[in-house]
Amino acid sequence: MKKKGLNFLMQVAIDGPASAGKSTVAKIIAHNLGYIYIDTGAMYRACTLIAHDNHVDYGDEKAILDLVDKSTIEFKQEDGEQKVYVNGKDVSIAIRTPEITENVSQVSALKSIREKMVELQREMAGKHDVIMDGRDIGTTVLPDAEVKIFLIASVASRAKRRFLDFQEKGIHQDLKDIEHDIEVRDYKDSHREISPLKKAADAIELDTTNLTIDEVVAKISEIIQKKQKN
């Protein structure tokens, strides 16, 4: 574990493909254990919002990086929920608007922005007990994390989860289309040049296809608690 004063910090990395349940599980475990949950996707959304609010083109890498360098992105736990702050302002809702959602992929693909976010993610992980989820946390962002989990699940089960999630939000999309989208996303994530989706050699693989959220939370929590005792 990383040492902070007389205390030791725990780093938990959860990686895996889209809709494998990473964020849902990570949020619950972070809340239960009092860890900071670092939503790496929200960080790229924050960068996109910074560009938007400053009327900068989403492909202008240098301008966006200059703005991000002058900004602060923070996560705070408030009333059991994680809030995202940019320059002291709560932007938790602002980063989820259609405008930001439609353009975050372009911003997150910028090499210097990814490098900057990885730097910030490591900085955050050096100050708190953290649980972080993404595609390359255990391999790139936190290669020395005490606990590394790689969640997998069948395309069919992941598509069904996303389908139900969409239904709850009033979004209607054909299940077969969702399955296709996930297959395409899997290919892109595992073949991209910068930080591709890859299981770390020392990660514990957990198939969530036939597991409930509570069962996944229990299994990962047990792994973390065993590591804390060592």
From Swiss-Prot:
Catalyzed reactions per annotation: CMP + ATP = CDP + ADP; dCMP + ATP = dCDP + ADP
Gene3D superfamilies per record: P-loop containing nucleotide triphosphate hydrolases (3.40.50.300)
Amino-acid positions noted as binding ATP in the UniProt annotation, renumbered to this chain: G16, P17, A18, S19, A20, G21, K22, S23, T24
Cellular component GO terms held in the UniProt record: cytosol
GO molecular function per UniProt: ATP binding; CMP kinase activity; dCMP kinase activity
Keyword Cell inner membrane: no
Main location: cytoplasm
One GO biological process term: pyrimidine nucleotide metabolic process
Keywords, comma-separated and alphabetical: ATP-binding, Cytoplasm, Kinase, Nucleotide-binding, Transferase
UniProt entry tagged with the keyword Kinase: yes
Compartments reported by the entry: Cytoplasm
One Pfam short name: Cytidylate_kin
EC number in record: 2.7.4.25
Entries under PANTHER family matching the protein: CYTIDYLATE KINASE, CYTIDYLATE KINASE/PANTOATE-BETA-ALANINE LIGASE
Family, as annotated: Belongs to the cytidylate kinase family. Type 1 subfamily.
NCBIfam families named among the record's database cross-references: cmk (TIGR00017)
Protein known as: Cytidylate kinase
Biological source species: Lactobacillus gasseri (strain ATCC 33323 / DSM 20243 / BCRC 14619 / CIP 102991 / JCM 1131 / KCTC 3163 / NCIMB 11718 / NCTC 13722 / AM63)
Source taxonomy: Bacteria, Bacillati, Bacillota, Bacilli, Lactobacillales
Gene: cmk
